[in-house]
């Protein structure tokens, strides 16, 4: 581990030397690449320098204890030694986490698909509530939401909603949300007061750029139809809605949220790129999982990941056995505790894998 850290420190110093040369800005592409690499390495290099300084403090305290006879000075050295040793353990753990491989998609925007599953109207109502939950969380993170498609059930529920969340690090925070979300409560339509269980499927996909996915437009078929739902005066009077079919995979995407056919077409292509990119990521994940211990969940949208029990005010994430009795807060978008716990569990699993390799 420390050989790797020393290599990173040397590389960081090389970059700084290059950036200090007066001619560095002559090649703007090279300059931007160096600046990005410096930013990427900055945090781990700073932490490694802190580690080295703390080790030096320990050595100096030990030397002082060997040489010093004054009791007051010896007590100060003992305190400094104890503090430095405790700090060293913490810094070493922080370095291990910083050395974990970065997910190249973490900084990306996300496309979110929420669909009602088992439970009919009750599932659709809960799908709408999950949309509100993620919208509230996005609001606290100062992210922007862009609706792509909405299929309502007539009583305030969503059979399906597709939307994009634009914001730095959106995928890093929301990537653990993919899977089946189960709700247990008494539906408003239940006259007998019985608790029902319904399910909603959530898919979180990183936005795919054109460079991420090779898309042959000859493989795409576009059909237009009249919008049904919100959309202003153009609803049901113009063929502005778009249905995109990707013939090699059979993926079908409908977008009708915009009044413009062209905008709906662009949104459908964004969703298609994200789904094709997700298929590639799933293949890579399956290959990696065959060689490594499982991390936090499988990322499979068919995996049951969480239960929201309204009579008990309880939310349980089954992957990490986390139970919270702050259900109302969670449904109002206060997801940070859950997200932080999932991130920590994922990091712990990756650390275990890394230690097996050393």
From Swiss-Prot:
Question: Mind telling me which SMART domains this protein's record contains?
Answer: PCRF (SM00937)
Name the domain of life: Bacteria
Q: Which residues carry this modification: N5-methylglutamine?
A: 233
Localisation: Cytoplasm
The protein's matches in InterPro entries, at most eight in alphabetical order, are given as: PCRF, Pep_chain_release_fac_I, Pep_chain_release_fac_I_sf, Prokaryotic/Mito_RF, RF-1
Molecular function terms in GO for this entry? translation release factor activity, codon specific
One GO cellular component term: cytoplasm
Can you summarize the PTM annotation of this record? Methylated by PrmC. Methylation increases the termination efficiency of RF1.
Major location category of this protein: cytoplasm
Q: What keywords tag this UniProt record?
A: Cytoplasm, Methylation, Protein biosynthesis
What the entry lists under Pfam families is as follows: PCRF, RF-1
Q: Its biological function? A: Peptide chain release factor 1 directs the termination of translation in response to the peptide chain termination codons UAG and UAA.
Q: Which family does it belong to?
A: Belongs to the prokaryotic/mitochondrial release factor family.
For this entry, the protein name equals Peptide chain release factor 1
Organism from which the protein derives = Lachnoclostridium phytofermentans (strain ATCC 700394 / DSM 18823 / ISDg) (Clostridium phytofermentans)
Identify the coding gene: prfA
